[in-house]
Amino acid sequence: MTKYVCTVCGYVYDPEVGDPDNNINPGTSFQDIPEDWVCPLCGVGKDQFEEEA
């Protein structure tokens, strides 16, 4: 699965890990995360993430 990087702080969303602290289960693709989810480190929205190169 594709990882996504926060362009503001560099946090990497890894679908294999998810974001359990914010109720995103492992195996959840970035596209399937709710639109109101924010970066757990800096708080920006999904629109500030880019696919990892």
UniProtKB/Swiss-Prot annotation:
<keyword id="KW-0813">Transport</keyword>
<keyword id="KW-0249">Electron transport</keyword>
<feature type="domain" description="Rubredoxin-like">
    <location>
        <begin position="1"/>
        <end position="53"/>
    </location>
</feature>
<dbReference type="GO" id="GO:0005506">
    <property type="term" value="F:iron ion binding"/>
</dbReference>
<dbReference type="InterPro" id="IPR050526">
    <property type="entry name" value="Rubredoxin_ET"/>
</dbReference>
<dbReference type="GO" id="GO:0043448">
    <property type="term" value="P:alkane catabolic process"/>
</dbReference>
<dbReference type="InterPro" id="IPR018527">
    <property type="entry name" value="Rubredoxin_Fe_BS"/>
</dbReference>
<keyword id="KW-0479">Metal-binding</keyword>
<dbReference type="InterPro" id="IPR024922">
    <property type="entry name" value="Rubredoxin"/>
</dbReference>
<dbReference type="InterPro" id="IPR024934">
    <property type="entry name" value="Rubredoxin-like_dom"/>
</dbReference>
<comment type="similarity">
    <text>Belongs to the rubredoxin family.</text>
</comment>
<feature type="binding site">
    <location>
        <position position="42"/>
    </location>
    <ligand>
        <name>Fe cation</name>
    </ligand>
</feature>
<dbReference type="InterPro" id="IPR024935">
    <property type="entry name" value="Rubredoxin_dom"/>
</dbReference>
<keyword id="KW-0408">Iron</keyword>
<comment type="function">
    <text>Rubredoxin is a small nonheme, iron protein lacking acid-labile sulfide. Its single Fe, chelated to 4 Cys, functions as an electron acceptor and may also stabilize the conformation of the molecule.</text>
</comment>
<feature type="binding site">
    <location>
        <position position="6"/>
    </location>
    <ligand>
        <name>Fe cation</name>
    </ligand>
</feature>
<dbReference type="GO" id="GO:0009055">
    <property type="term" value="F:electron transfer activity"/>
</dbReference>
<dbReference type="Pfam" id="PF00301">
    <property type="entry name" value="Rubredoxin"/>
</dbReference>
<protein>
    <recommendedName>
        <fullName>Rubredoxin</fullName>
    </recommendedName>
</protein>
<feature type="binding site">
    <location>
        <position position="9"/>
    </location>
    <ligand>
        <name>Fe cation</name>
    </ligand>
</feature>
<feature type="binding site">
    <location>
        <position position="39"/>
    </location>
    <ligand>
        <name>Fe cation</name>
    </ligand>
</feature>
